[in-house]
């Protein structure tokens, strides 16, 4: 019987990101603290259909060809491992592509969870998490969301206390750098000693201390991305000047964020921030997906 389901897929920020080294398989070992935030894509999944279809709104959202999209890759895994029939997906983008905010990972997680629910595939949490990791390192986190410490390539997840209530101003410059460019430049520099951000962030979260959290956020890759896209550092400086408790880049960028105690202060900072192609005020959320 044909049906449809809408799933909201939340973005993530990295309160901390440390690069610990390069593994034999070419991936980088990291330690990170991840937080879901109230910026989202929406997937409308319908099926079963005669063939897979993906429509992205708005056009030109920068998600790439269908066969390279994480949504398609997630469906192919479901088809191969669980016999999932084709579905039609309308993907409404609210998370900017190539931002380090996990939009592609969130979309894949939404497809895995949503198609499993819609089609009655009967996959459990462990099954979905295993498939999620085959799509990408951040996809397992996006399935569950909330606040977590991630290790390995980010797939080993340890839940953490939710942060004290606050607002984030998320901003993205007009141009950035790809993940491959950033890690390539990082490797070319020979890397650096990890910044130790995650330990300080974890202590701040466990203490429920927002000021300490703001002071602790950090990302080992910020100097690399800023070297490729100098606007990143300008946006970080603008957020600090606007009164952010702390400002940091998310993932490999080029999106950055600032933490604010009050919503009014966050909106004022967003209004005054110059040099951004994208600015939103959002808040932490306790899950990665919402739908039904």
From Swiss-Prot:
Keywords: ATP-binding, Isoprene biosynthesis, Kinase, Nucleotide-binding, Transferase. Its EC number is 2.7.1.148. The active site is at 12, 138. It catalyses: 4-CDP-2-C-methyl-D-erythritol + ATP = 4-CDP-2-C-methyl-D-erythritol 2-phosphate + ADP + H(+). ATP binds at residues 96-106. GO terms for biological process: isopentenyl diphosphate biosynthetic process, methylerythritol 4-phosphate pathway; terpenoid biosynthetic process. Belongs to the GHMP kinase family. IspE subfamily. Catalyzes the phosphorylation of the position 2 hydroxy group of 4-diphosphocytidyl-2C-methyl-D-erythritol. This is 4-diphosphocytidyl-2-C-methyl-D-erythritol kinase. It comes from Rubrobacter xylanophilus (strain DSM 9941 / JCM 11954 / NBRC 16129 / PRD-1).
């Amino acid at each position: 019987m044909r049906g449809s389901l809408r799933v909201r897929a939340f973005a993530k920020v990295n309160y901390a990101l440390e690069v610990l080294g390069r593994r034999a398989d070419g991936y980088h070992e990291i330690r990170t603290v991840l937080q879901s935030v109230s910026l989202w894509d929406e997937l409308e999944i319908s099926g079963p259909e005669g063939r897979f279809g993906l429509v992205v709104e708005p056009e030109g959202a920068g998600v790439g060809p269908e066969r390279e999209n994480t949504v398609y890759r997630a469906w192919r895994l479901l088809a191969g491992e669980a016999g999932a029939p084709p579905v039609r997906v309308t993907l409404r983008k609210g998370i900017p592509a190539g931002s380090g905010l996990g939009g592609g990972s969130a979309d894949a997680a939404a497809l895995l969870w949503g198609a499993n629910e819609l089609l009655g595939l009967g996959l459990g949490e462990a099954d979905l998490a295993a498939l999620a990791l085959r799509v990408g390192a951040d996809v397992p986190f996006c399935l569950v969301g909330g606040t977590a410490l991630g290790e390995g390539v980010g797939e080993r997840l340890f839940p953490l206390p939710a942060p004290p209530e606050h607002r984030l101003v998320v901003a993205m410059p007009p141009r950035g750098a790809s993940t491959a460019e950033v890690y390539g430049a990082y490797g070319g520099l020979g890397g650096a000693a990890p910044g130790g951000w995650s330990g300080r962030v974890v202590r701040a979260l466990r203490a429920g201390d927002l000021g300490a959290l703001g002071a602790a956020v950090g990302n080992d890759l910020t100097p690399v991305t800023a070297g490729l896209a100098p606007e990143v550092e300008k946006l970080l400086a603008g957020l600090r000047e606007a009164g952010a408790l702390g400002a940091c880049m998310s993932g490999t960028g080029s999106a950055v964020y600032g933490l604010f105690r009050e919503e009014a202060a966050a909106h004022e900072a967003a209004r005054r921030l110059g040099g951004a192609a994208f600015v939103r005020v959002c808040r932490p959320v306790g899950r990665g997906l919402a739908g039904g």
